[in-house]
Amino acid sequence: MTSIIKLKVFSGAKDEGPLCYLLQVDGDYILLDCGWDERFGLQYFEELKPFIPKISAVLISHPDPLHLGGLPYLVSKCGLTAPVYATVPVYKMGQMFIYDMVYSHLDVEEFEHYTLDDVDTAFEKVEQVKYNQTVVLKGDSGVHFTALPAGHMLGGSIWRICRVTGEDIVYCVDFNHKKERHLNGCSFDNFNRPHLLITGAHHISLPQMRRKDRDEQLVTKILRTVRQKGDCMIVIDTAGRVLELAHLLDQLWSNADAGLSTYNLVMMSHVASSVVQFAKSQLEWMNEKLFKYDSSSARYNPFTLKHVTLCHSHQELMRVRSPKVVLCSSQDMESGFSRELFLDWCSDPRNGVILTARPASFTLAAKLVNMAERANDGVLKHEDRLISLVVKKRVALEGEELLEYKRRKAERDAEETRLRMERARRQAQANESDDSDDDDIAAPIVPRHSEKDFRSFDGSENDAHTFDIMAKWDNQQKASFFKTTKKSFPMFPYIEEKVKWDDYGEVIKPEDYTVISKIDLRKGQNKDEPVVVKKREEEEEVYNPNDHVEEMPTKCVEFKNRVEVSCRIEFIEYEGISDGESTKKLLAGLLPRQIIVVHGSRDDTRDLVAYFADSGFDTTMLKAPEAGALVDASVESFIYQVALSDALLADIQFKEVSEGNSLAWIDARVMEKEAIDNMLAVGTSNLMIDDKNREEDVNDQEENGATEGEGNAEPMEIGENGSQESLAISESGKEVENGHTNDSRTKKGTKGKIRGNLILDPLPKRLIPIHQAVFVNDPKLSDFKNLLTDKGYKAEFLSGTLLINGGNCSIRRNDTGVFQMEGAFTKDYYKLRRLFYDQFAVL
């Protein structure tokens, strides 16, 4: 493994916050998820901004806000332009998640982080992929990645990132190996000992119930609530795990023996109808056992949800009679309908709230889960049911605030009207200037009074005006300097409209293409349509004030309220994540070379790390970073990228090893680009001076007889490996030979710091060490025997030894894999040896 692999953790390490990691593979930067939670912290976005121009791709694993909630912010506010890759369901359901989150906040406060238009712009950058589809990263790095099923949410993915060298990097967080009603479980059969495994420890230490017991408990809790004339709220997400529960409850309502058909089942979110519609069109991403056929052999869509009523507002929910069961978003209860309904229903002891997941500890849902667990243990006190909440509402303006709003609105409307009229005036002036040429050509027709008295049939005078086409024609003729041979006669006035053009051609007028149907004036309708007798109310268009309802001015208020939770609180886990014991066994079975544990509380992370350590895993290859840490996952500790200089490329002699692969032996030294530029900038003048000085030194040595003795010659220093040491570069950019430098302040043997822009430059010929020949290839003796036969030699095998020409020469391979050739020193021997050498690439 010679790749540079690093992981920068921005968020989602040793906590339950959103997930965001930056993976570096050589020169490519891949962003793994970009989530956001209800706190909307901007700290990790500020840390990520310097890396955004370097990002080559963004990989999204799941559609919920914890995995992609920050994508619109990165695109709209941080300038992210890299392509985003996600599966088709993650693309569609991810939009539903973000839409619902934005609408939920706009209902109670001003949400300024991004708008719905920003959401649409961000998702336009998403490139949709399918499972097992290989996507090659743009560029020549050879990095490609594949999405595999995660089993947690519809379209959820485990990403496998590969290089051309074959090493795998697996990013798997929030996966489920168990098959559910609407999803298949994940599978790790396609992974063959990855080089790096990036995994999560989310809730790995918490026990899970059996699926059958969990479903029975859910039905029991619902029945106990609705039979007491209470309403039951099931807190669930927007477009992920809600599909599992909606399908389960729809089946229960279809079963008459369950006793639930007399009650109403509601699915409530701002995008409920869109979520169900998308689910109907994505059956190929679901469990194959989900498909059923009725008696007519027609395919039945399992997400028709005949017993589920879709609601998008409180007004629609109020029309559904109680008792009712409501699947309500959002899951953490920090915003959305779940928080609003809880404030309305928590004071009634007949109502019930069922929580299905463990969100972050700062949320309202986490407090209620803790309350439910304490109630089951019998240690919940009355004062524990009192909780303080921040209530946010949007209320209508009244009194002075309403008058002030109307005054400002009138000023804005007046200003907009003035600007609109000004634009219209300027446009009219522009049109008049365009038609000025036509006005000069057309002859004006001047109205005048008739010289005669016109009388009507009843003898009365009529002072009506008349238009004489010949009036003042002679006066309107323009004098011309040149004599005209053809007389021009007056015509009826016609001003040809100037055709307007833009960058795309002639401007199209929609009214020119309007199809006018034949109208029967007696009936007032089309002839092709049948005559229908309508009531008077239907024929006349009566203005309905509800058709143009003016949006009422509102303001956002926020206050603290202490509420008593009198309703029943239950927790039934429907999170869809593998249990801790199964997760540990699955991850250990992958036999990864390195593991980075993220996305989990400190206790869960410590538990998973301890399991790997107890299993005999190398603890030096096991990392559990903090948020903001940089993890180096490269095998070699010191790997640097260098470029080949033009001088070195000119001297390299490649030898083909196999088809498309060539090798070459190089003798070079590592230098900084600035040092080479300085050497080239010196020019030939310094070279001439050096040559002159060298000649003078040689002459002086000859005169002094220094060349005859060897006592003054310094011995050549030999490296530890027996070869002569090459040149290095000191911190100041000067050449250092064998640990010495011209700068007396530099100590012998001190290594310079490695900087960027490193270049391999040819080693001077006097410093090139002698190396033994290297034979590259692994030929087969059977293939060489066929070659000898084609050349006219007699060759045969005897006990694994290739005998040539009756044993005059033999070639065999010993136990260590080394070829041995024996024979008499004849011309044939040297020919055979040369022929055998040709099977290798000799460097």
UniProtKB/Swiss-Prot annotation:
Positions of disulphide bridges: none
* Region of interest: Disordered: 414-443, 691-753
Q: Which InterPro entries match?
A: Beta_Casp, CPSF2, Cpsf2_C, CPSF2_MBL, Metallo-B-lactamas, RibonucZ/Hydroxyglut_hydro, RMMBL
What Pfam families does the entry give?
Answer: Beta-Casp, CPSF100_C, Lactamase_B_6, RMMBL
**GO CC term, one of those recorded:** mRNA cleavage and polyadenylation specificity factor complex
Instruction: Say if the entry is tagged with keyword Transmembrane.
Output: no
Annotated GO biological process = mRNA 3'-end processing; mRNA 3'-end processing by stem-loop binding and cleavage
**Record-level Gene Ontology MF annotations:** RNA binding
Return the Acidic residues bias intervals: 432-441
The domain of life for this entry's organism is: Eukaryota
Q: Which cell locations does it reside in?
A: Nucleus
Task: Cite the record's Basic and acidic residues compositional bias ranges.
Answer: 414-425, 732-746
What are the entry keywords? Answer: mRNA processing, Nucleus, RNA-binding
**Chain segments annotated as coiled-coil in the UniProt record:** none
Q: Which family does it belong to?
A: Belongs to the metallo-beta-lactamase superfamily. RNA-metabolizing metallo-beta-lactamase-like family. CPSF2/YSH1 subfamily.
Oligomeric and partner information: CPSF is a heterotetramer composed of four distinct subunits 160, 100, 70 and 30 kDa.
Q: What does the record give as the function of this protein?
A: CPSF plays a key role in pre-mRNA 3'-end formation, recognizing the AAUAAA signal sequence and interacting with poly(A)polymerase and other factors to bring about cleavage and poly(A) addition.
**Which protein, by its recorded name, is this?**
Probable cleavage and polyadenylation specificity factor subunit 2
